[in-house]
Amino acid sequence: MVIKAQSPAGFAEEYIIESIWNNCFPPGTILPAERELSELIGVTRTTLREVLQRLARDGWLTIQHGKPTKVNNFWETSGLNILETLARLDHESVPQLIDNLLSVRTNISTIFIRTALRQHPDKAQEVLATAHEVADHADAFADLDYNIFRGLAFASGNPIYGLILNGMKGLYTRIGRHYFANPEARSLALGFYHKLSSLCEQGAHDQVYETVRRYGHDSGEIWHRMQKNLPGDLAIQGR
């Protein structure tokens, strides 16, 4: 186990998460007692207690007053906020994780983009107009793309879609910085935003579904060609 955390709390958090991931602390089992675990990791009990509370909030553990701390099956109890952690833990599975993430984005965005353009066209156009001034480099496009999808999610009138995008932000923007280094990807995205703006202006809401699906397919083709050069820094760094 190689841990690169920059603080005692970060070290303890990574130690416990990696132990859960590697089945040293299997789902359904009881975590060692606080004193034993703090000595094992090499941190104070106060630090450990703070870390355990944070991991419980993220779904890794269940803490109940007067009972031992239980290890959860994180696939069943955690949220989107652990995406980057999963990417760090299992780099070999990152391509599949990203494919799943992008598939979810396409599937839900066919719904909220159509709703945004139909029910709140002025808000949708305001979001899409931000593409007019974007600088032609990867970082700018990564932020723009995330903010356009997120903005349209909230413009749909259903904030739950926006919260889902919030949960994807970390890994989503890291992927974007790699993906949008490709000029073809930037050009495709600009064409997509322009097409959505035109559909909104024309009131052609019935064409949104196919437009979004086509963009998901075409951007996926570019992404798959780029995966062989996937960088190793898509996961978060140690705390």
Curated annotation (Swiss-Prot):
Q: Does the keyword Kinase apply?
A: no
Keywords on record: Activator, Cytoplasm, DNA-binding, Fatty acid metabolism, Lipid metabolism, Repressor, Transcription, Transcription regulation
Q: CDD domains given for it?
A: WHTH_GntR
- The chain positions of domain HTH gntR-type read 6-74
**Which Gene Ontology CC terms are recorded?**
cytoplasm
Q: Residues annotated as DNA-binding region?
A: 34-53
- Subcellular location field: Cytoplasm
Task: Cite the Pfam families for this sequence.
Answer: FadR_C (PF07840), GntR (PF00392)
Q: Which GO terms describe its molecular function?
A: DNA binding; DNA-binding transcription factor activity; fatty-acyl-CoA binding
GO BP term, example? fatty acid metabolic process
Q: How does it assemble?
A: Homodimer.
NCBIfam families attached here? fadR_gamma, PRK04984.1
Biological function: Multifunctional regulator of fatty acid metabolism. Represses transcription of at least eight genes required for fatty acid transport and beta-oxidation including fadA, fadB, fadD, fadL and fadE. Activates transcription of at least three genes required for unsaturated fatty acid biosynthesis: fabA, fabB and iclR, the gene encoding the transcriptional regulator of the aceBAK operon encoding the glyoxylate shunt enzymes. Binding of FadR is specifically inhibited by long chain fatty acyl-CoA compounds.
Protein name as it appears in the record: Fatty acid metabolism regulator protein
Point out the gene that encodes the protein: fadR
